[in-house]
Amino acid sequence: PSFAPDGSRIVFNSDRGGAPQLYVMNSDGSNQQRVSFGQGRYTTPVWSPRGDLIAYTRIAGDFRVGTMRPDGSGERLLTDSWQAEAPSWAPNGRVIQFFRTAKGSGKTSIWQVDLTGANERKLPTPVDGSDPAWGPVFP
């Protein structure tokens, strides 16, 4: 689960309807609403720093990172390759990092993509990397 930046809502995934899908509810647990309706399973939801988008992993034969608005509209897949998962927002809300598992080898690496789905690139790390997370930004 992930809290909206203002703390008023929570996004989470649940398999209550069969395959895991995304739901948004008020922080007190009321007003639970399903917001994902695509094919496959939806996991690892996380609110953007501005609260205007939710990033997630969609699993439908492959793993892809996407975004949607909190009401479920505007769904957009940002990656189109083998096993991209576990999105993490940059503090400015313009870039998403994720990890990818290489087909065949099982090696993992950190990647990032901007919100247009362009400018996808592998980030250099000395060893395999997974589950990226951003630290606080200090002036």
Segments (PLM) and residue ranges:
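Sequence signature of WD/YWTD-type beta-propeller architectures
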Residues: 1-139
